[in-house]
């Protein structure tokens, strides 16, 4: 089954040439972006890495996302990419894995790695084959053009989380560590925005707690802060999955808000790029 783009023309351009140019400008942005283009990949990724990446419209979060993909390229070309995104639509299964076929973007198609899907499904108590959770969801889709831009041809496993409980995060982390035994060069992307629709000062404070939990590599601290500080982070389950995978290092690459782009600091959304290795 081919999954057609749901948010091309909304979150990012629907024309190939315009999309390539916008991604280029996200990398070359010197105010919020890294100010440089990624170098061509010359090596293979040898060990698993995790990436925290935002998923708003490219005009807002694209320059922050570019930091993560610029760094990921330096580790090498992945053998497979797993993208974990939150379910914003309420459709489908609690933990939905798109099982086969390919995903289309204006830059071409990306095949689903069926062997990697099999490994995850056979080692998870919660993950299920599911198309419906992905049909209208944007959180996974917006990562794919960046992947295509920096790596060219890759294969992937899309996982959409309606259930973002600690039990699911621990379960998925265990399944992904089994996957890494067969695909050592796996790149796992946790697609998330941080605090939503509060003023700049409040969002910077709340986002700092999320950043602390990631730097501490502590999933329990993440869940504790979400409740204690009332943080409206949408993709915390994917991030908690990464924090359960025993990465030795966590590096914060860039944090900004939509207000840093638009100038409107009254209701902003926080964006973060971080890499775990």
From Swiss-Prot:
<protein>
    <recommendedName>
        <fullName>MEMO1 family protein TRQ2_0860</fullName>
    </recommendedName>
</protein>
<dbReference type="Pfam" id="PF01875">
    <property type="entry name" value="Memo"/>
</dbReference>
<comment type="similarity">
    <text>Belongs to the MEMO1 family.</text>
</comment>
<dbReference type="InterPro" id="IPR002737">
    <property type="entry name" value="MEMO1_fam"/>
</dbReference>
């Amino acid at each position: 089954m081919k999954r057609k783009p749901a948010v091309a023309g909304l979150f990012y351009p629907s024309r190939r040439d315009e999309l390539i140019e916008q991604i280029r400008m996200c990398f070359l942005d010197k105010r919020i972006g890294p100010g440089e283009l990624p170098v061509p990949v010359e090596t293979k990724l040898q060990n698993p890495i995790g990436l925290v990446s935002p998923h708003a419209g490219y005009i807002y979060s694209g320059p922050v996302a570019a930091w993560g993909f610029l760094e990921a390229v330096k580790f090498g070309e992945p053998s497979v990419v797993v993208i974990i995104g939150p379910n914003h639509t309420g459709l489908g299964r609690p933990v939905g894995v798109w099982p086969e076929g390919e995903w289309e973007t204006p830059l071409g198609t990306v095949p689903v790695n069926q062997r990697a899907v099999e490994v995850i499904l056979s080692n998870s108590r919660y993950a299920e084959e599911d198309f419906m959770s992905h049909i209208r969801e944007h959180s996974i889709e917006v990562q794919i053009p960046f992947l295509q831009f920096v790596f060219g041809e890759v294969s992937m496993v899309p996982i959409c989380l309606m259930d973002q409980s600690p039990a699911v995060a621990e379960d998925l982390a265990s399944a992904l560590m089994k996957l890494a035994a067969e695909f050592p060069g796996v790149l796992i992307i946790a697609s998330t925005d941080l605090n939503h629709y509060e003023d700049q000062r409040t969002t910077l404070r709340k986002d700092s707690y999320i950043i602390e939990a990631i730097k501490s590599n502590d999933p329990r601290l993440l869940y504790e802060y979400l409740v204690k500080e009332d943080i409206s982070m949408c993709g915390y389950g994917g991030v908690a999955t990464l924090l359960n995978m025993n990465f030795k290092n966590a590096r914060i690459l860039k944090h900004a808000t939509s207000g840093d782009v638009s100038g409107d600091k009254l209701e902003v959304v926080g964006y973060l790029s971080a890499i775990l290795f």
